[in-house]
Curated annotation (Swiss-Prot):
GO BP annotation list: protein desumoylation; proteolysis
PROSITE patterns with a match to the protein in the record: ULP_PROTEASE
Gene Ontology molecular function, alphabetical: SUMO-specific endopeptidase activity
Organismal lineage: Eukaryota, Viridiplantae, Streptophyta, Embryophyta, Tracheophyta
Region (Disordered): 204-224, 825-931
Protein name: Probable ubiquitin-like-specific protease 2B
Active site: residue positions: H489, D522, C577
Hydrolase among keywords: yes
EC number: 3.4.22.-
Family according to the record: Belongs to the peptidase C48 family.
Keywords assigned: Hydrolase, Protease, Thiol protease, Ubl conjugation pathway
InterPro entries linked to this entry: Papain-like_cys_pep_sf, Peptidase_C48_C
Source organism: Arabidopsis thaliana
Amino acid sequence: MKKNFEVFDFKEEDELAESAAGKLLEKFTNPSPCNSPVLQRQRIQSFCNEKRVEEEEMEGPSCAEPATAVESDDHQCEDDSTLVTEAKESRTILTFGLETTDHLEETDAEHVNQGLMLGLKTEDLAKETDIDHDNHGLMFGLNSEDDIEETDVDHRVESFSCQLGGNSFYAETSSYSQRQLNSPFSDSSSSEEQIDMMSAIDESLSDRSALSEASDSEDDEEDWMTEHCFNDEEKIDLSTAVIMTSEYVILKDMHCAASLVIFSCNGIKIKSFLANNEEVPFSCEFGVEDIVSIQYNWYQNVGLIILRIRVLLKDENCHEDMEELKIAVKEHNWPNKQQKINSLHVKYPAVWNTDLEDDVEVSGYNLNQQKRYFPSFDEPFEDVVYPKGDPDAVSICKRDVELLQPETFVNDTIIDFYINYLKNQIQTEEKHRFHFFNSFFFRKLADLDKDPSSIADGKAAFLRVRKWTRKVDMFGKDYIFVPVNYNLHWSLIVICHPGEVANRTDLDLDDSKKVPCILHMDSIKGSHAGLKNLVQTYLCEEWKERHKETSDDISSRFMNLRFVSLELPQQENSFDCGLFLLHYLELFLAEAPLNFSPFKIYNASNFLYLNWFPPAEASLKRTLIQKLIFELLENRSREVSNEQNQSCESPVAVNDDMGIEVLSERCSPLIDCNGDMTQTQDDQGIEMTLLERSSMRHIQAANDSGMVLRDLFDSGSNNTGSLLEQLQQPFEDPSSFYHLSNDSSAREQVDMETGEQFMCLNAGEGNFQCITETTSPRASNSFSSWNLGIPLVQKEDETDLLSETSNSSNDSIGIIEDNPIENTHEEEIDESPPRETVSLKSATVGSNTADHTTENEEPVSTHIELVVPSSQNDRDEEKPLEHDLEIGDKTSEDVGDDCDQKEPMEEEDEKRAAKRPRLSSPTGEAEEMEK
């Protein structure tokens, strides 16, 4: 069958279209001043002004008044028939060259002697009549994008329908537009109707032109709007108000299209046009006192303002409630408008840009129930380490948190922080299925810091990160997540079931539940092209590293591993790519099946589809991460506060616990209840409070009921260094709280339970450092001590030994027992062991020191205190220590009173001299025995 190609032949009719197209294209070149629309409009005005009559002499309705544009059908038909008859007599035809998507056929020149063409041009082509037929064409450039049906010239059907777009003059009603366009012209000398029509068109054009975007006069616009939207009683003073034309107004469930928005000193008034074909025009008014806040979004490129005004409304019961009034206004010069509005009343600048996150209460009712969370970090910010104790922990500083502000790029610290957070949310039994790389892995893999062009070299890329995965079973994981930061953009790589590549063939993979593949999730699709080869090569090299004998078949499978670029929700701005990465990852962890296959992704669940989630949901992650960091800060503050409270509180007495405190005698033997110490250069001593019961277990007792302190000292070790050597081993026991320091200088430590500070000294050191302060009074700590059970009767050899040691020095050592002699046996069998105090003190202290006796409120419990002083020249370790032993009873006193009263030990001893059983004489008595 022969095809007909005549439709492709070039005809003479096409020449007209080509010529019309050429003329249209000429208008897009440098404009000629003689053909400007302004000059054409001036020609029309001059033509009409010559034959214009006074408006008072006109009869019939005026087309220039839109309020009276809607007339009865009888008058309209009568006017139309009269005008058509006159047009036939004058053989004048009004042709409107209306351009639509189709080309208009040329008007038959034989039937037209004079033609007036009003061309409402758009982007399509219009054919003009041949000027050889002496047609006088007059064109109005009234650029419209809508379609108008052309008049049937042959049958003289004068029916038009016009729908004017946004770029043409405004016409609220179809009747007004139809009345304006359905009026043909007669000859200029035939009748007054032509003059009326031209006058009406001219007035209408001048009125409507003020509302178009090309209008140069703002005052004309306001005059026109106030004239057609308000009656005489509602006229407003333009000098004290700001008027704007809205695209739409929304208040609760009420919607209104074109209307006026008036800001005045009294408030805000909204009124729709009178000709909106509504029974009751939309109107509302709010006083200045009813305005709660005003916020706006200015889209400067299109000149659109979205106003969100929160106002107070009263219901039928006169209860106030807050509603949002949303207004869209087209305004290119918004800053000037805003300045004028603020000058109307002092309330406007006060409520402008009010933070809507603050709760607003009206009559005791919280109007903002759904308060969005935006934490403030104005206070000093302490770095957050998360997760604490993890080798991959992330440290977040204040600068990182500031990047969570709107319209800001998030950095790698925020990305890694939230990935660690998601990783910790996974169940413990499920963690082995996932592996998460941090944001630095891809940077190291692609070597972006040195040579970004090497991103295609997979072998070299693997060698750079080989240590990262040496201890990770990469091919035993179900999912491996790789955050990608490349070319200032974030995306996510998910490697699914990589171990299945070597275990299954391509034929098996189609029917397999686990299909190995690489998923690329990109919020700006196409921006990270070129990652396919890098990831495939890396996996191949990783497999070869773990399997030395790898066949070429398996290598080819890795190199041909499926790389799927998913169609996912896309970001709507240029700075939320990192948030989309995190949201992709979070939703994938929540919805990913145990066995994944890209061939079995169903649209029913929206999983990994374009409608997976709304884009705004990912953008809101800024607030979520801010809240999460703020909660971590609060938890850390509570922990620190609890530690401080525990350090200030007295610990609970436990029978097996003791405190240890090693002090320098250089800081003096005088210690008050607040931990302050007075220094003396001559007298030195050591005060020790035992920590653990196990610390004294190595001490051997002289008999079954007690302990002898001479076992602490060797015959050849009489200095303080050897004493510390004896005590060092029990301190290093794991059960003790602190160990002695091996540093050259003393180190201060704090007991976390009691809050006290301790000084640990090296063994053998004679120069002790003083503790400047203690966090809590030493005497306030009530420790349960070990019942030493010191015997009341001393053996002869022990007495001799003690006498010998007392002769070698002027120092004296006293052991004072709190228990009376008659109650000794009763206390030994008591269930609660008594608390005792052992004092080793220097005789050289004399009256320069005030040794205190500690008393407890409990009658059965006593306190043990060891004071080991040295001689004045204890810096010289070769000088021996001379001790004397004194054993006696004492009663307990309140520690607080002891600190305040500071009674010396000598007065206590004199009062209780009769009650003390002397097992060894004091210093003076020892000297008499020697004599």
